[in-house]
């Protein structure tokens, strides 16, 4: 048990994806009022860049991660949804970008791993006795929103996707060298995903 309130209980979960080397992990939050035999919808709640699954279930308003995410996975659980907050490997400043750079020449990306992780997560969620396998949604914030625009389009089992805070002026941000808000002037050199906005 990771955390428990009057309305829900959460668990830290680890799932094998490709043996023990590549795995998926996150926080499953389950409302306490689920009746025997009842199946509830699930919302997969994705953190952003440098985030962790714990960030989206944080309910202490004095914590910085609450200021960013407002505990949206916990709030959804309070409203009766099952939530799963997975970890995505876009952490460690430049470390995940090195993996991305190494993957590109062999025709892969960081999302090649993330997609495999999410396929396993969805399969697992669909197999739980208290989840509605036809109602698994995806909600991502910031880099999680980037994930929301890519993963549910490929992974079978998501019924809808919400992208929050990762969609405005995208082509201009990626392609510009004339404006200071362009990614070319940041440490996020992995952003120019050419032809994505075409």
Question: What are the roles of these predicted feature ranges?
Answer:
Residues 1-38:
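N-terminal cap/lid segment of alpha/beta-hydrolase-fold proteins
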Residues 35-127, 172-179:
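Cap/lid segment of the alpha/beta-hydrolase catalytic domain
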Residues 47, 87, 139, 164-165:
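Alpha/beta-hydrolase-fold catalytic nucleophile elbow
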Residues 113, 160-198:
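Mobile cap/lid helix-loop segments that gate and shape the active-site cleft of serine hydrolases
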Residues 130-142:
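Alpha/beta-hydrolase fold nucleophile elbow
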Residues 140-152:
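Glycine-rich nucleophile elbow surrounding the catalytic serine of serine-hydrolase chemistry
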Residues 153-159:
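Conserved hydrolase catalytic core segment
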